[in-house]
Amino acid sequence: MASNFTQFVLVDNGGTGDVTVAPSNFANGVAEWISSNSRSQAYKVTCSVRQSSAQNRKYTIKVEVPKVATQTVGGVELPVAAWRSYLNMELTIPIFATNSDCELIVKAMQGLLKDGNPIPSAIAANSGIY
C-alpha cells in the first residue's frame, strides 16, 4: 500500500497563490504537514488514527490557518502571524466498515464543505446559520 504521507494542496486558489503543505514530522502516531512559510506563519495540518475502542477507529484532524500581517521593527517590515483560525475534526469509523463505506464517508465530508452549501457559506461570510 502506498504511503498517504505526501504533500498536498490545502488551499486551492486556482493555481495562483495556492497553499501546499508538505510532510514535516511523524511522531507517536501523529502526522504533521506544514506550508513552506516559517513555522510561526505556516499553515499546519495534523492527523492521527487511534483505536478508540475494540470496535472503532478514531481519526483526529486539526488545521491551523494563520492570518499573516506585516510588523515594522526598527524600520524593517517583518511578516508575522497576527492571529490563527483552528479547525478540529473527529471522525469515528467502525473497524468492520468496508472500503466502500469509508469512501462514502469521505464523499459526505467533501459535500459538507462544498462551495455554496450552508456551512461553508456561513464560515466564508463570518456569520451564523439561519
From Swiss-Prot:
Pfam family membership, one? Levi_coat
Task: Give the result of residue 60 to S, as annotated.
Answer: Loss of repression of replicase. 20% loss of binding to the operator RNA in vivo
Q: Any coiled-coil ranges, and where?
A: none
* GO terms classed as biological process: negative regulation of viral translation; regulation of translation
Q: Which GO terms describe its cellular component?
A: T=3 icosahedral viral capsid
Summarize the impact of residue 46 to A.
Loss of repression of replicase translation. 80% loss of binding to the operator RNA in vivo
Q: Where is this region: Viral RNA-binding?
A: 32-105
Q: Which domain of life is it from?
A: Viruses
Q: Which GO terms describe its molecular function?
A: identical protein binding; RNA binding; structural molecule activity
Subcellular location per UniProt equals: Virion
Q: Which UniProt keywords apply?
A: Capsid protein, RNA-binding, T=3 icosahedral capsid protein, Translation regulation, Virion
* Main location group: virion
What the entry lists under InterPro entries is as follows: Levivir_coat (IPR002703), Phage_RNA-type_capsid (IPR015954)
Please give the family membership noted in the entry.
Belongs to the Leviviricetes capsid protein family.
Q: What role does it play?
A: Capsid protein self-assembles to form an icosahedral capsid with a T=3 symmetry, about 26 nm in diameter, and consisting of 89 capsid proteins dimers (178 capsid proteins). Involved in viral genome encapsidation through the interaction between a capsid protein dimer and the multiple packaging signals present in the RNA genome. The capsid also contains 1 copy of the A2 maturation protein. Acts as a translational repressor of viral replicase synthesis late in infection. This latter function is the result of capsid protein interaction with an RNA hairpin which contains the replicase ribosome-binding site.
Q: How does it assemble?
A: Homodimer. The capsid proteins form dimers that assemble by group of 5. Twelve such pentamers are linked together with free dimers. The homodimers binds to the viral RNA via an operator hairpin, but also to many other RNA sequences in the viral genome; this interaction probably shifts the virus from the replicative to the assembly phase and ensures specific encapsidation of the viral genome.
The protein depicted here goes by the name: Capsid protein
Organism for this UniProt entry: Escherichia phage MS2
- Lineage of this protein's species? Viruses, Riboviria, Orthornavirae, Lenarviricota, Leviviricetes
